[in-house]
């Protein structure tokens, strides 16, 4: 008869009672020298056995076979003072649990077995009184206690079995001699006649080492005998075995559970994070090589509405940085086309292209490089970094993302030349003109586009040359002479006024650019010419004998002559103000 193969650990959960007195203080140890035995762990009630039913751990054949005692292999002492056997109301003290007692606990070590058979035997052995091994009966199903079930289910080493598992196995004390082993850890508790409660835990999983001829006696009131052999243990159906395997095995994504709590991963994919407020996914790539350039190690590949798109963006960025050695979310064979395209681009250019293909970020960042949304105005602002003492340079606010992206591109070309990483294609800009331009970079960056467009449009329009301007002045002089030679020359003609709106429309053709200095010089010449013509006309109509008759004329004639000399100057009173062009 082999020793039982269970590893039961039982301890009392009730107030301790007085251990029964005994003439012998030596504990009887059992032998666990069988090749397939696993000794039970027993830490039972600290009081004597009060039930009159016969108790035994092994049959008499097993006790006779246990010839070799392990009395010489003591490794630890009992927790109970042997003097407690002589007291009926003794309560255990702290020293009782510190190993200073004279009682001995036997330890069995079998070198022939594959596993080490360690046992913490009974602290109190009822065989001293009944010549039989004792184990407490009247056990109940431990599954009924939800508190212990939740407590032991959290252990990594053992879990509370279901009702089917406990039904297949017999809890501690249900059988007098031997506890039927199960495929998993078992829990049980005992309520004795004295109201005490003992807890048993079976942690033995070696179900293959069975005895074919185990005979057990049921420890109930009927004393029913039960025969259990190895065939009963091997009668598990295939479905039960598959069920046990499925319960243990875990999927590949078990470690990639989505958790919305703070401090945990928010995506099942590598390099992807989920925004806590908006629910959008962003792809991030950590690059340590750019630390020497003053940039942050965390690069952004854009924001996405779907998680798999963000994972693909991370995979492409990782393949660009680390080639085939990169750890990707999807197989590398899925990116064969993209790998060929990224060979002709730098790392920064490829990352910028990934951002442009995204649907924007969650926290105000734009899909364009160097562009962010203002948190109050709602407008888009452009900044460029590492240009002014390793600091950001503010480029202004813009109505659209595209305008802000163009301002960033122009500033990048200005400071970094043809090697600049831009949001749009480089052939969109005149790189040489931008690099030679003296316009400031910053608040005037958004006016740079208008200046370039005005310069481009002026090249297409006809320019008024010096020869054409001289010919035009001669035509205007001829028209003035014709008007002055007319009989009604005293009438006011606004066509003669060089600063009038009518003449300005005739002099300057629509759509022809001009310089303000040249136009002012032209107006001065016309004014001088008009004054000369007026003086000539005045002396021609003045009477010749006005000077000889001046002494003899009366006061009325003098007043009339004086009023005639005070003719209004048309250039002074009838000139329209200069218009701002």
UniProtKB/Swiss-Prot annotation:
Residues 108-122, 218-232 have a biased composition (Low complexity). One of its GO terms (cellular component) is nucleus. Residues 268-331, 367-425 bind DNA. One of its GO terms (molecular function) is DNA binding. Expressed in roots, seedlings, hypocotyl, inflorescence, siliques, and pistils. Also detected at low levels in leaves. InterPro entries: AP2/ERF_dom, AP2/ERF_dom_sf, DNA-bd_dom_sf. PROSITE patterns: AP2_ERF (PS51032). Keywords: Activator, DNA-binding, Ethylene signaling pathway, Nucleus, Repeat, Transcription, Transcription regulation. Its main location: nucleus. It is found in: Nucleus. Residues 105-132, 205-240 are annotated as: Disordered. It comes from the Eukaryota. The keyword Transcription regulation applies. SUPFAM superfamilies: DNA-binding domain. GO terms for biological process: ethylene-activated signaling pathway. Probably acts as a transcriptional activator. Binds to the GCC-box pathogenesis-related promoter element. May be involved in the regulation of gene expression by stress factors and by components of stress signal transduction pathways. Belongs to the AP2/ERF transcription factor family. AP2 subfamily. PANTHER family: AP2-LIKE ETHYLENE-RESPONSIVE TRANSCRIPTION FACTOR, AP2-LIKE ETHYLENE-RESPONSIVE TRANSCRIPTION FACTOR AIL6. This is AP2-like ethylene-responsive transcription factor AIL6.
């Amino acid at each position: 008869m082999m020793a039982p193969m269970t590893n039961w650990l039982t301890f009392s959960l009730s107030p301790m009672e007085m251990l029964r007195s005994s003439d012998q203080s030596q504990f009887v140890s059992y032998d666990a020298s069988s090749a397939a035995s696993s000794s039970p762990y027993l830490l039972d009630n600290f009081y004597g056995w009060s039930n009159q039913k016969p108790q035994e751990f092994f049959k008499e054949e097993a006790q006779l076979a246990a010839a070799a005692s392990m009395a010489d292999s003591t490794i630890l002492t009992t927790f109970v003072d042997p003097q407690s056997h002589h007291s009926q109301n003794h309560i255990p003290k702290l020293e009782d649990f510190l190993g200073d007692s004279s009682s001995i606990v036997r330890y069995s070590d079998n070198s022939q077995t594959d596993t080490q058979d360690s046992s913490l035997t009974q602290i109190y052995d009822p065989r001293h009184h009944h010549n039989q091994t004792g184990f407490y009966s009247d056990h109940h199903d431990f599954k009924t206690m939800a508190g212990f079930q939740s407590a032991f289910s959290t252990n990594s080493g053992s879990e509370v079995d279901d009702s089917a598992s406990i039904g297949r196995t017999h809890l501690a004390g249900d059988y007098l001699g031997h506890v039927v082993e199960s495929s998993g850890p078992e829990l049980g508790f005992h309520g004795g006649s004295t109201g005490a409660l003992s807890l048993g835990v079976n942690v033995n999983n070696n179900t293959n080492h069975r005895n074919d001829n185990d005979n057990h006696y049921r420890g109930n009131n009927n004393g029913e005998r039960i025969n259990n052999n190895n065939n009963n243990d091997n009668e598990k159906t295939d479905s039960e075995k598959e069920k046990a395997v499925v319960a243990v095995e875990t999927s590949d994504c078990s470690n990639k559970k989505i958790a919305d709590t703070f401090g945990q991963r928010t995506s099942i994919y590598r390099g992807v994070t989920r925004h806590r407020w908006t629910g959008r996914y962003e792809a991030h790539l950590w690059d340590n090589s750019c630390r020497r350039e003053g940039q942050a190690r965390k690069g952004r590949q854009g924001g996405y509405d779907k998680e798999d798109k963000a994972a693909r963006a991370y995979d492409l960025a990782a393949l660009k940085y680390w080639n085939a050695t990169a750890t990707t979310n999807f197989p590398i064979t899925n990116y064969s086309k993209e790998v060929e395209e990224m060979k002709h681009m730098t790392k920064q250019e490829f990352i910028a292209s990934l951002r442009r293909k995204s649907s924007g970020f969650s926290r105000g960042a734009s899909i364009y490089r160097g562009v962010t949304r203002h948190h109050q105005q709602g407008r888009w602002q452009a900044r460029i970094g590492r240009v002014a003492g390793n600091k950001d340079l503010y480029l202004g606010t813009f109505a659209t993302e595209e305008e802000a992206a163009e301002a960033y591109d122009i500033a990048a070309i200005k400071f970094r030349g043809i090697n600049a990483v831009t949001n749009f294609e480089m052939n969109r800009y005149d790189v040489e003109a931008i690099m030679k331009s003296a316009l400031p970079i910053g608040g005037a960056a958004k006016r740079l586009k208008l200046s370039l467009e005005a310069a481009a449009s002026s090249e297409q329009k006809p320019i008024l040359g010096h020869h054409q301007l001289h010919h035009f002045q001669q035509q205007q002089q001829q028209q003035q002479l014709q008007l002055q030679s007319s009989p009604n020359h005293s009438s006011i003609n606004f066509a003669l006024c060089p600063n009038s709106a009518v003449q300005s429309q005739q002099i300057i053709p629509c759509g022809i650019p001009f310089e303000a200095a040249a136009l002012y010089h032209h107006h001065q010449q016309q004014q001088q010419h008009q004054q000369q013509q007026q003086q000539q006309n005045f002396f021609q109509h003045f009477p010749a004998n006005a000077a000889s008759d001046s002494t003899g004329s009366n006061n009325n004639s003098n007043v009339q002559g004086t009023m005639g000399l005070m003719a209004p100057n048309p250039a002074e009173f009838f000139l329209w103000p200069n218009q701002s062009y």
